[in-house]
A protein has these predicted regions:
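Sec-dependent signal peptide recognition
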Residues: 2-9
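Residues embedded in well-ordered secondary-structure elements
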Residues: 7, 50-52, 147
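A generic structural signal for short, solvent-exposed coil/turn residues
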Residues: 10, 39, 53, 138-140, ...
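C-terminal motif of bacterial Sec signal peptides marking the signal peptidase cleavage site
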Residues: 14-17
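Bacterial signal peptide processing site
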Residues: 19-21
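Short N-terminal edge-element motif at the start of the domain
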Residues: 23-31, 36
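Surface-exposed acidic loop/strand-edge motifs in secreted or periplasmic proteins
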Residues: 36-136
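Extracytoplasmic electrostatic interaction patches
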Residues: 104-174
């Protein structure tokens, strides 16, 4: 009987020790090279998780062109992302929130997010197209696009405007 109690106590101690070391470290950044503002030369896409706790963290997405000039920056508060997913995800513990944010960083540069070209010649703009002239420019230039999500209900599609020499949103949807 004492042997069984000792064994049970040992197992509980081991389990408790494993549980207390369950801290999840945040991924700091991911980088991807991609032809975006030019059809041949690559730009640097970077997603960075800034902050130490989910309540004060932000996802910072930047694009630096092949000349080293930052051409795009979007910062999203982690709390905004977490709120958008709280209904469908169980994110009560800090470690779960950090794990979720790490997943978002890891998925940010999935191949499906890089669109070659941004708009094909047979695609037509719809109500989610904020700038129809830019959409037509993309049909002509055949430059690549990229899309990312700011939550489960908002996707933003961006591309380089050769006419305006800046990154613009060409589609925004659910």
């Amino acid at each position: 009987m004492k042997y069984a109690q000792l064994l049970l106590l040992s197992l509980i101690s081991i389990f408790t020790a494993c549980q207390s070391n369950n801290k999840v470290e945040a991924i700091t950044e991911k980088i991807k090279l991609y032809a975006f503002s030019d059809s041949i030369q690559t730009d640097t896409f970077k997603i960075k998780l800034v902050g130490s706790k989910s309540d004060d963290m932000s996802l910072v997405f930047t694009i630096v062109n092949f000349d080293g000039v930052q051409i795009y920056k979007e910062e999203v508060k982690a709390t905004q992302l977490l709120k958008s997913y709280l209904a469908s995800e169980d994110l009560k513990k800090e470690s779960d929130k950090i794990r979720f944010l790490n997943d978002q960083v890891n998925l940010f540069f999935d191949e499906e997010h890089f669109l070659e070209p941004a708009v094909t010649t047979n695609q037509e703009p719809d109500n989610n197209t904020p700038d129809k002239a830019f959409y037509e420019e993309l049909k002509q230039s055949q430059l690549n696009g990229f899309y990312y999500s700011l939550g489960k209900d908002t996707s933003i599609y961006i591309a380089w405007s050769t006419k305006e020499q800046k990154v613009k949103i060409y589609y925004q949807c659910c």
